[in-house]
Swiss-Prot record:
Protein name: Chaperone protein DnaK
Compositional bias per record (Polar residues), positions renumbered to this chain: 604-618
Pfam families: HSP70 (PF00012)
UniProt-annotated stretches for the region Disordered: 604-630
């Protein structure tokens, strides 16, 4: 069986790992880095850049540089109004209230943008392994709902991957932490604060079994929010000092975002940092510069509410697992934002123990995903993962009530059935509305799908027996069926939210993604060929200048003709002609080296003859002693 790679598809950064024997390996990307920024840039001419190359040009191309797309995955446009305030690129309302990224005259779904990041991860693994990769385990925040999980799976399919399993990020981290601790029985907490989401999971480890006891979280809390409080502070301070509002300047905002992220990182190891942004904007009076010192104490004050927000899910998770903080043996910190000292301090205070620093918070999730891939492929044995569904699942019943069929923190996969009936006499059809959440009224929760059961046998209200079955697979994705027990009539759906994509749309996007990959490869090949042409032109002109007098006029003329032809091909970007003239010039240069060598040998021989004749002439001269006569 081919390798199943593990991908951590993050809000800020992504990472890919593979199993090598019994050990997981984090795979460096083409830039030599172990994590890749989850950033896509659309360049003039149709080229796309992914990762660090995209991040480097963000300041000069803010409207076409896409970041934090994970925050829009599987969500409706009406749900993302706050997120829209924090991005310089354009997102508009698409069909069925879906968010669409607008680039020029083309619209992209969040799944398509995420697929571009996944393609980069796929290519990174393929370059390392030396063969094509088709299967992957992809991680999601534990608190992702069904629609967000479906969207992640769709992104994988668009990228050309068979998504063998969707796994929760804290669970993946626990797998990575506990793989070599099979003989230890422990209760561990995984506190996972990533770029855009926060999760808390409590697991029990022992004898190769990883059982999730409870999970909670906040899908609107992450490192981006910590950056935002710094940005807001800078904007406010600059407006007071200079009277200029930077929040509406997309290029200035992008510079503020980069500086805020750097300041946050520096304050993890320093007590203060200087934010220096010359020429941040200009007014009629001249250019304006932003120079501010941010102390760790001020940053902690700005982010205090965010840190407190992360503790509420911690309380909920403990309560759901019927544990208290003293029952916890180990606390694992995951996600780059957990490097913030105040977070470490608050987590230690809450759980009454020092968090473990034995794992790399940026890499541990992808490592766990690779281990799960190894379990699925049979490379990793004696490991059993028992995950849970993060939110309750149910249907709408009479009066708009949300009736739960599966409670939150139920171990998956699982299946549950209940009998319902009609609300009116002789009702021939019912609409089953499926929801996910913890509120008592259906409309206060997230509707994740609906379908109709028709041709119900006429009967007084309350008589028909309609069996509704919920079936959650190991990916946490839901299938729902409804059956009229008197007629045997059955209707079922694999839940696909309004933000989901049809099979035809996924196939179309897969095709477009491959075409874009081919297009990018063509652009890359074109650049490489032009670079080769420039190198050959330089070398040939240098050879003509240095050795032009040592080759025949015929050879010299051939070189000059083909050199001019290569320059024309290079300027017109004609790849086939560039290859043709490079080959011709290389062949001519090869023969010219022989001419140069022969000329050099001839010169050496002539010098040798002259030296010999000089020696012979000198043989008749004898050395004698002489005495000066005075």
């Amino acid at each position: 069986m081919s390798k199943i790679i593990g991908i951590d598809l993050g809000t800020t950064n992504s990472c890919v790992s593979v199993m090598e024997g019994n050990s997981p390996v984090v795979v460096p990307n083409s830039e030599g880095k172990r994590t890749t920024p989850s950033i896509i840039a659309f360049i003039e001419g149709g080229e796309t850049k992914v990762g660090d190359p995209a991040k480097r040009q963000a300041v000069t191309n803010p409207s076409k540089t896409i970041f934090s797309i994970k925050r829009f995955m599987g969500r409706n446009f009406s749900e993302v109004t706050e997120e829209l305030k924090n991005i310089p690129y354009k997102i508009i309302k698409g069909e069925n209230d879906t968010p669409r990224v607008s680039i020029g005259n083309k619209l992209y779904t969040p799944q398509e943008i995420s697929a571009m990041i996944l393609q980069k991860m796929k290519k990174t693994a393929e370059d390392y392994l030396g063969n094509e990769v088709k299967q992957a385990v992809i991680t999601v925040p534990a608190y992702f709902n069904d629609a967000q999980r479906q969207a992640t799976k769709e992104a994988g399919e668009i990228a050309g991957l068979n998504v063998e399993r969707i796994i929760n990020e804290p669970t993946a981290a626990a797998l990575a932490y506990g793989l070599d601790k099979n003989n230890q029985n422990k209760k561990i907490v995984v506190y996972d604060l990533g770029g855009g989401t926060f999760d808390i999971s409590i697991l029990e480890l022992g004898d190769g079994v990883f059982e999730v006891l409870s999970t909670s979280g906040d899908t609107h809390l992450g490192g981006d929010d910590f950056d935002k409080v710094i940005i807001d502070w800078l904007v406010k301070e600059f407006k007071v000092e200079q009277g200029v509002d930077l929040s509406n300047d997309s290029m200035a905002y992008q510079r503020l975002k980069e500086s805020a992220e750097k300041a946050k990182i520096e304050l993890s190891s320093s007590t203060k940092t200087e934010i220096n942004l010359p020429y941040i904007t200009a007014t009629p009076s001249g250019p304006k510069h932003l120079v501010k010192t941010l102390t760790r104490a001020k940053f902690e004050e700005l982010s205090d509410d965010l840190i407190k927000r992360s503790l509420y899910p911690c309380k909920n998770a403990l309560k759901a697992s019927n544990l208290i903080s003293k029952d916890i043996d180990e606390v694992i910190l995951v996600g780059g934002s957990t490097r913030i000292p105040k977070i470490q301090e608050q987590v230690e205070k809450f759980f009454e123990k020092i968090p473990s620093k034995g794992v790399n918070p940026d890499e541990v999730v992808s490592i766990g995903a690779a281990i799960q891939g190894g379990v699925l492929s049979g490379d990793v044995k004696d490991v059993l993962l028992l995950d849970v569904t993060p939110l309750s699942l149910g249907i709408e019943t009479l009066g708009g009530v949300f009736t739960k069929l599966i409670d939150s923190n139920t171990t998956i996969p699982t299946k549950k059935s209940e009998i319902f009936s009609t609300a009116t006499d002789n009702q021939s059809a019912v609409t089953i509305r499926v929801g996910q959440g913890e509120r008592s009224m259906f409309n206060d929760n997230k509707e994740i799908g609906r379908f109709d059961l028709i041709d119900i046998a006429p009967a007084p209200r309350g008589i028909p027996q309609i069996e509704v079955t919920f079936d959650i697979d190991a990916n946490g994705i839901l299938n729902v069926s409804a059956k009229d027990k008197s007629t045997g009539k059955e209707q079922s759906i694999r839940i696909q939210a309004s933000s989901g994509l049809s099979k035809n749309e996924i196939e179309r996007m897969k095709k477009e993604a491959q075409e874009n990959a081919d297009k990018d490869n063509k652009i890359k090949e074109e650049i490489e060929k032009i670079n080769s042409a420039d190198s050959i032109i330089f070398q040939t002109e240098k050879q003509l200048k240095e050795y032009g007098n040592k080759i025949s006029e015929e050879t010299k003329k051939k070189l000059e003709i083909n050199l001019n032809n290569l320059k024309d091909a290079r300027n017109s970007k004609n790849i086939s002609d560039i290859d043709n003239y490079i080959n011709k010039i290389n062949n001519i240069l090869s023969s010219s080296y022989q001419e140069i060598y022969k000329n050099n040998e001839s010169v050496k021989n002539n010098e040798s003859v002259k030296n010999n004749e000089s020696v012979k002439n000198n043989e008749s001269v004898k050395d004698v002693d002489f005495e000066e006569i005075k």
